[in-house]
């Protein structure tokens, strides 16, 4: 009997059965996950060949799937295969999705109602031939920082949430740093690159998990900077030596730069009110996954004025002027999130927006000298001095990060940044200490219907259990609880540092009674037209106060301290009431200074505030880290996404003086398109209660807040994100 024919092993890598060309499809069980991905890849190629397609010279959906499945491979074969097909993706023409043997196996992707049912997602038409030619030329020249598969090249890019796996990484990746970026030409003037996309896509992954992919696009207008220099500027309320302003003190020192900051770190940049309603009503937990952004379709223009009266402005395209782009991937520069100043990109995709000027604090010494004794008539004086020479930190973008020079038609992509943050709950907690654990046993229950007929309890000195007061009275007020939900914190306290006085931040929690906003950290928002104000006039501002839904706050007007040992007299003897002064000061009461934070404190995270709230924040570089940040619910455990800076390069004239800090310049401005993708994972709400719950909705009276007026005015109201209740215990 002849021996059985040997299976073709082809050129498989050592230790693998399928990873390599020329092998048969019946080699047995794969040796590891990368080998399993290779087996599935070979089977897909076999289907292509049987259907008359040649997958070896085209980039196919099977190649894309293999890239995704080996993205985090630890074995050498998986890494080799991953980067081989990424290189193929950059240069090979692509098969259309209709040629994919796995098209019918893609999971359902539900999109927000904003997506037109008849529209096609980007990435369907063949890539222009010049894309591959330009990339090949740049590859030959050794431009190592070229991003070979940027977002704007999604004329052939698959939908990023196809298949129930992680989003495919395009361009340079970051595993927790600031992300890598690169600029390149995109075919020159007149070649359209990229798409304008503001959809929010929801992919249901099963087992209650959802991937939310938020796309944002804006047209950004950028004027050339007023100056090309860095300026250290002191700011004072008034001249030094006159009356100080105390709580209205503004004195500081800042470094003003010629650069602008593109900041998309606000909820309103990524979601519209309908998206937020869907998320807050249906999700109980959300977490950040990844972030990427891109600049494309750069247009640079110059302005000249005629000598006529009145002068006539003439606008011309400038094909040689440059837009400077810098990405601080390693967070070298001072971190300056723009949301607390309401200076992020605008919230309305149909309106052009602009970046904010980049500036940062410098060390300074601020002194407020009050009178030395009560009744002294001397004014409070103020002064400001340059910080100690050992504390000065002067940064310039030009020597801190690489700078890319873009001309008309060029583009820049940051690559993908991956977050490392804790999940955020989108529910509120109603339970306080008085509602934790087992309630007391009733002595009698009511027999008549109606809340006005209560039950009764046994006498306080006959109840069983334990508490922390050394007497025989066991009441709901003295019952011991497992932990402390929330805490009392000093409020309206101004600590003092070298830089001057500052209001001690407290965790925002909703008040329990009497609308005590300040003791519970309510946040006051002030915004302009780009960020939610109704009016079309840029001179007006709108304000609102935001109280989160969490019930972990305190009612300072009803707090009291009792003497020890506990005295049960019915008078106020031994009881310190909120109205009782401390140290003879009629305006100082104990709830202003009492801090009950300790090892037993249980606390909820900072609530997200749509649309004006900041999304993520940078972790402080201290040995002892704060548990929460007031400004943002997500705190990046590693470096946050790198800050993106832009600046129009100096467009000089022939009148140049090397001894002058300011040179004559041709008036130049730029319009360019920015877009980004921010990805979340979320958990869907499950219904375990009998009663229905309150959800975010609108009424006939306030629906007008979400639609424009007859002259285009529109408003973005704050929307609560934690309406769904949850129990703590």
Swiss-Prot record:
Q: List the biased-composition ranges (Basic residues).
A: 112-128
Q: Which InterPro entries match?
A: Capsid/spike_ssDNA_virus, Parvovirus_coat, Phospholipase_A2-like, VP1/VP2
Q: Which residues bind Mg(2+)?
A: 330
What positions carry the motif Nuclear localization signal? 4-12
- Segments carrying the region annotation (Phospholipase A2-like) are 18-63
GO biological processes: clathrin-dependent endocytosis of virus by host cell; microtubule-dependent intracellular transport of viral material towards nucleus; symbiont entry into host cell via permeabilization of host membrane; viral penetration into host nucleus; virion attachment to host cell
Q: Identify the Pfam families for this entry.
A: Parvo_coat, Phospholip_A2_4
Question: Molecular function terms in GO for this entry?
Answer: metal ion binding; structural molecule activity
Q: Does the keyword Magnesium apply?
A: yes
Compositional bias segments (type: Gly residues)? 173-186
The listed locations are: Virion; Host nucleus
Biased composition of type Polar residues is found at 24-34, 98-107, 163-172
Q: Which UniProt keywords apply?
A: Capsid protein, Clathrin-mediated endocytosis of virus by host, Cytoplasmic inwards viral transport, Host nucleus, Host-virus interaction, Magnesium, Metal-binding, Microtubular inwards viral transport, T=1 icosahedral capsid protein, Viral attachment to host cell, Viral penetration into host cytoplasm, Viral penetration into host nucleus, Viral penetration via permeabilization of host membrane, Virion, Virus endocytosis by host, Virus entry into host cell
Its Gene Ontology cellular component terms are: host cell; host cell nucleus; T=1 icosahedral viral capsid
Principal location listed in the UniProt entry: virion
Cited Gene3D superfamilies: Parvovirus coat protein VP1/VP2 (2.170.30.10)
List the residue ranges of the region (Disordered).
1-37, 94-129, 163-186, 437-465
Q: What is known of its domains?
A: The N-terminus of VP1 is sequestered within the mature capsid. It contains a phospholipase A2-like region and putative nuclear localization signals.
Something else the entry says is: VP3 might be a post-translational cleavage product of VP2 in several autonomous parvoviruses.
The record's family statement is: Belongs to the parvoviridae capsid protein family.
Quote the function comment for this protein: Capsid protein self-assembles to form an icosahedral capsid with a T=1 symmetry, about 22 nm in diameter, and consisting of 60 copies of two size variants of the capsid proteins, VP1 and VP2, which differ by the presence of an N-terminal extension in the minor protein VP1. The capsid encapsulates the genomic ssDNA. Capsid proteins are responsible for the attachment to host cell receptors. This attachment induces virion internalization predominantly through clathrin-dependent endocytosis.
- Tell me what this protein is called: Capsid protein VP1
Write down the species: Porcine parvovirus (strain NADL-2)
């Amino acid at each position: 009997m002849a021996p059985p024919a040997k299976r073709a092993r082809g050129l498989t890598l050592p230790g693998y059965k399928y990873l390599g060309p020329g092998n048969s499809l019946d080699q047995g069980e794969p040796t590891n996950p990368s080998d399993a991905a290779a087996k599935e890849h070979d089977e897909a190629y076999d289907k292509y060949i049987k259907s008359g397609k040649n997958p070896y010279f085209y980039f196919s959906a099977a190649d894309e799937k293999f890239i995704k499945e080996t993205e985090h491979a630890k074995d050498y074969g998986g890494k080799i295969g991953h980067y081989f097909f990424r290189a193929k993706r950059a240069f090979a023409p692509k098969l259309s999705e209709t040629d994919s043997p796995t098209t019918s196996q893609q999971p359902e992707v539900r999109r927000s109602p904003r997506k037109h049912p008849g529209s096609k997602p980007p990435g369907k038409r063949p890539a222009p031939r010049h894309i591959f030619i330009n990339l090949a030329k740049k590859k030959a020249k050794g431009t190592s920082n070229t991003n070979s598969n940027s977002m704007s090249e999604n004329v052939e890019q698959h939908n990023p949430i196809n298949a129930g796996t992680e989003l495919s990484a395009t361009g340079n990746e970051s595993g927790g740093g600031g992300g890598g970026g690169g600029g390149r030409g995109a075919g020159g003037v007149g070649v359209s690159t990229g798409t304008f996309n503001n959809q929010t896509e929801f992919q249901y992954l099963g087992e209650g998990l959802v991937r939310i992919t938020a796309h944002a696009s804006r047209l950004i207008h950028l004027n050339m900077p007023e100056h090309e220099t860095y300026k250290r500027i002191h700011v004072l309320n008034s001249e030094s030596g006159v009356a100080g302003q105390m709580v209205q003190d503004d004195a500081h020192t800042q470094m003003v730069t010629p650069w602008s900051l593109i900041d998309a770190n606000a909820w309103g940049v990524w979601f519209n009110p309908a998206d937020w309603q869907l998320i807050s009503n249906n999700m109980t937990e959300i977490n950040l996954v990844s972030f990427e952004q891109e600049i494309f379709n750069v247009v640079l223009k110059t302005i000249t004025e005629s000598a006529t009266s009145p002068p006539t402005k003439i606008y011309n395209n400038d094909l040689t002027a440059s837009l400077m782009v810098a990405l601080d991937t390693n967070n070298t520069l001072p971190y300056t999130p723009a949301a607390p100043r309401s200076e992020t990109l605008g919230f309305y995709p149909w309106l052009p927006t602009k970046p904010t000027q980049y500036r940062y604090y410098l060390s300074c010494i601020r002194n407020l000298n009050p009178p030395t004794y009560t009744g002294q008539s001397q004014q409070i004086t103020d002064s400001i001095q340059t910080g100690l020479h050992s504390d000065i930190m002067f940064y310039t973008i030009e020597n801190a990060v690489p700078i890319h020079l873009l001309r008309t038609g060029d583009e820049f992509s940051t690559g993908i940044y991956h977050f490392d943050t804790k999940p955020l709950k989108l529910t509120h907690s109603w339970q306080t200490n008085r509602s934790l654990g087992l309630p007391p046993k009733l002595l009698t229950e009511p027999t008549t219907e109606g809340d006005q007929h209560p039950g009764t309890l046994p006498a306080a000195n006959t109840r069983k259990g334990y508490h922390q007061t050394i007497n025989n009275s066991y009441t709901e007020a003295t019952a011991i609880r497992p932990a402390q939900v929330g805490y009392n914190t000093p409020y309206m306290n101004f600590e003092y540092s070298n830089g001057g006085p500052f209001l001690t931040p407290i965790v925002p929690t909703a008040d329990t009674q009497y609308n005590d906003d300040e003791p519970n950290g309510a946040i006051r928002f002030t915004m302009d037209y780009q960020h939610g104000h109704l009016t079309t006039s840029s001179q007006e501002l709108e304000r609102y106060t935001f109280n989160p839904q969490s019930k972990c706050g305190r009612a300072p007007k009803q707090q009291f301290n009792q003497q020890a040992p506990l005295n049960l007299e019915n008078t106020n003897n031994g009881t310190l009431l909120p109205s009782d002064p401390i140290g003879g000061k009629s305006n100082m009461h104990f709830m202003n200074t009492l801090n009950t934070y300790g090892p037993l404190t249980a606390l909820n995270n900072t609530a997200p505030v749509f649309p004006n709230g900041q999304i993520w924040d940078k972790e402080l570089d201290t040995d002892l880290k704060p548990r929460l940040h007031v400004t943002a619910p997500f705190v990046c455990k590693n470096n946050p996404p790198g800050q993106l800076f832009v600046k129009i390069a100096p467009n000089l004239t022939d009148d140049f003086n090397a001894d002058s800090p300011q040179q004559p310049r041709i008036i130049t401005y730029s319009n360019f398109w920015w877009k980004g993708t921010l990805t979340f994972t979320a958990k869907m709400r499950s219904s375990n209660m009998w009663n229905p719950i309150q959800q975010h909705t609108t009424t006939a009276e306030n629906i007008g807040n979400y639609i424009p007026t007859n002259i285009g005015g529109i408003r973005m109201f704050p929307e609560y994100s934690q309406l769904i209740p949850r129990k703590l215990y």
